[in-house]
Design a protein with these regions (language model features):
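C-terminal motif of bacterial Sec signal peptides marking the signal peptidase cleavage site
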Residues: 8-11
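Hinge/cleft segment of the Venus flytrap/periplasmic-binding protein
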Residues: 271-327
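Flexible loop/turn connectors
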Residues: 239, 245, 249-293
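Flexible loop/hinge segments that line or gate small-molecule binding clefts
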Residues: 108-130, 245-252
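An alpha-beta-alpha
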Residues: 46, 137-184, 282-303
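Extracytoplasmic "Venus flytrap"
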Residues: 24-45, 49, 58-66, 94, ...
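Periplasmic-binding protein-like
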Residues: 26, 82-94, 116, 213-224, ...
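Hydrophobic alpha-helical segments within soluble ligand-binding/sensing domains
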Residues: 128-152, 258-277
Length: 327
């Protein structure tokens, strides 16, 4: 297990309050750092928040998720110094959801627990998730290059069928693709295991190779496994859609990405707690929040694609209907 501490110096002109006596301790997803996506965005948000608010940041990268509970218990049982203003503990990633219901909460009012990202609402724990259905829907609709009846299909590579956020991405992309006139959208799961499929980039790459030329677009919602799809796109000149962040640098044939601005959400949530703002224990951020969007890669413009303004104008309503139907 890797652990490290960051004491980051903020610029002299910063206007935010000084929280130099505050501490934020984070346990990241096992093997997640370096995915150039979701986990790296969270890490970037934590580092930016540490600079902005001038707190001490302690980061743990466990080899297995079970180590996360031991790290938490060490934090829970460690007494705070009298001059410590706040101490936040962050579970970063839905892999730790199984801990929520039976978690012992701190008695010290200066301590708070957070979890990124989960749909569970638990009293005493600050949780949130950033949706991706609307942004994926727009990416799917944009991927239809010709709706004049020509046969064209898309392929979605997904981690597993159990992750609700993966399901949002899969459903959104497929629904948008079909709504805009695509002829079909197949889905392939890398794993049937509850937490499987996120670190299988070789398998993702091989499956795409076996289906080279069978699809107009390749979209992946599989954590670090996405890099296998990006490699396939780069080497075989197939169109692909990025996930979690702007992935246009991975391949010139990735001309759009579904972006979840986890860094923005992390910065704002930690800032609110350090400033003792009253916020809900559970928050849901959808397309209206600005934390999810579909972006075009550098030098790619909207006029390359079919006009989907009739879909864009209704995307908030479309996402609301989906969320209500899947509660």
């Amino acid at each position: 297990m890797l652990s490290f501490f960051l004491v980051l110096l903020a610029g002299c002109g910063k206007e935010e309050a000084d929280f130099s006596q505050a501490r934020v301790e984070v346990v990241l997803s096992p093997g997640g750092v370096g995915d150039q996506g979701y986990n790296d965005q969270i890490l970037r948000g934590l580092q930016t928040a540490a600079v902005r608010y001038d707190f001490t940041l302690a980061i743990h990268i466990p080899e297995e998720k079970e180590q996360g509970i031991q790290i938490y218990n060490d934090w829970l049982n460690a007494p705070l110094d009298n001059d410590c203003e706040r101490s936040l503990f962050v579970f970063s990633g839905s892999e730790y959801e199984y801990l929520l219901q039976g978690l012992t909460l701190p008695k010290d009012a200066r301590k708070d627990v957070l979890m990124f990202e989960t749909e569970q609402a638990v009293d005493g724990i600050y949780t949130f998730f950033v949706g991706c259905y609307a942004a994926s829907y727009l990416a799917g609709a944009t991927s239809v290059l010709d709706n004049n009846g020509e046969e064209q299909k898309a392929l979605v590579i997904a981690a597993n069928p159990h992750d609700k956020q993966v399901k949002r991405a899969v459903d959104g992309y497929r629904d948008g693709y079909l709504a805009a006139g695509g002829n079909g959208c197949d889905v392939h799961y890398l794993s049937e295991e509850l937490d499987g499929g996120y670190r299988m980039q070789d398998e993702a790459y091989q499956f795409c190779i076996e289906n080279d030329g069978n699809y107009m677009y390749y979209f992946s919602a599989a954590g670090a496994s996405n890099k296998g799809v990006y490699r396939f796109s780069r080497e075989t000149y197939n169109f692909a859609v990025g996930m979690d962040d702007d992935m246009g640098l991975f391949s010139s044939f990735i001309n759009m990405s579904v972006v979840k601005h986890m860094d923005w959400a992390v910065i704002n949530l930690i800032g609110d707690l350090l400033n003792n703002k009253k916020i809900p224990y559970h928050q849901v951020f959808t397309y209206e929040s600005g934390y999810e969007e579909m972006v075009f890669s550098k030098e790619v413009t909207e006029d390359w694609f079919l006009d989907i303004s009739h879909i864009k104008n209704r995307i908030v309503e479309i996402e609301q209907r989906y969320e209500e139907a899947n509660q």
